[in-house]
Amino acid sequence: MTANEKSVRTETGKVVSDKMDKSIVVLVERRVKHPLYGKYVKRSSKLHAHDENNECRIGDTVQVQESRPLSKTKSWKLVNIVERAEKV
């Protein structure tokens, strides 16, 4: 990696909202060790991501990568859909 080349952050999560045009909300869960008790606790973050073709649906597992700010809350882009949700 050169001096002006950055590594791109990517996260995998589940789509919890696709109601906006060209945007999705992705829930990313991680496990963190509690500093005092040592138990692993689930922590989650909701990321607003750009979905250019409106191809994601609620329940899909997707991979997103960090990008420049696209709006007030949106600074992630959809990379690919890992797994489609089952149709009910």
UniProtKB/Swiss-Prot annotation:
A GO BP term, please? Answer: translation
Report the InterPro entries cross-referenced here.
Answer: NA-bd_OB-fold, Ribosomal_uS17, Ribosomal_uS17_bact/chlr, Ribosomal_uS17_CS
Tree of life domain = Bacteria
- NCBIfam families on file: PRK05610.1 (NF004123), uS17_bact (TIGR03635)
> What is the annotated quaternary arrangement, including any partners?
Part of the 30S ribosomal subunit.
Family statement: Belongs to the universal ribosomal protein uS17 family.
The name on file for this protein is Small ribosomal subunit protein uS17
